[in-house]
């Protein structure tokens, strides 16, 4: 965290911090002038004990509670409907507590399902805008064969956060890359985000 602060970052996302207690993470971030703006939190814990998840985020001073990936059992035409049903209660609890459930996608959400829609369409249809936001990942939108700028425009009111990640190629292989070292049009992407003005946090990610 000290190194991030020295680079000049002022906001961070927490993900996979292991057994470090929320209070300890808050103290570490506070000591380095970093504000926690988003987490990726175990979705199973959200289902079993959403009250504790909300309480932990109160300690962290973090409003946005993120699902890093849809659990595999939901990644079917029937499963995605179960996902929206199962997570509706924690999403409402988070909203009522002044938080927002955030969903981070990959590329499989663009897979066409039986209804002719894709999985992302179902999420947007079933969850009202005040119940779920989308953490858009520039790499994974491109990997899905979708247009990054069109997707940003479509999801603008849900995009509290955007993961900035580039895509490079080696032969026929797609590779994650540092922003600016791949082929995504980040000048165009950033100008669009600035013009729309709905995204609060741009989070640089390097898997």
Predicted features and spans:
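Long hydrophobic alpha-helical segments typical of transmembrane helices together
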Residues: 182-207
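Generic structural signal for well-ordered alpha-helices
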Residues: 1-2, 22-26, 50-54, 84-91, ...
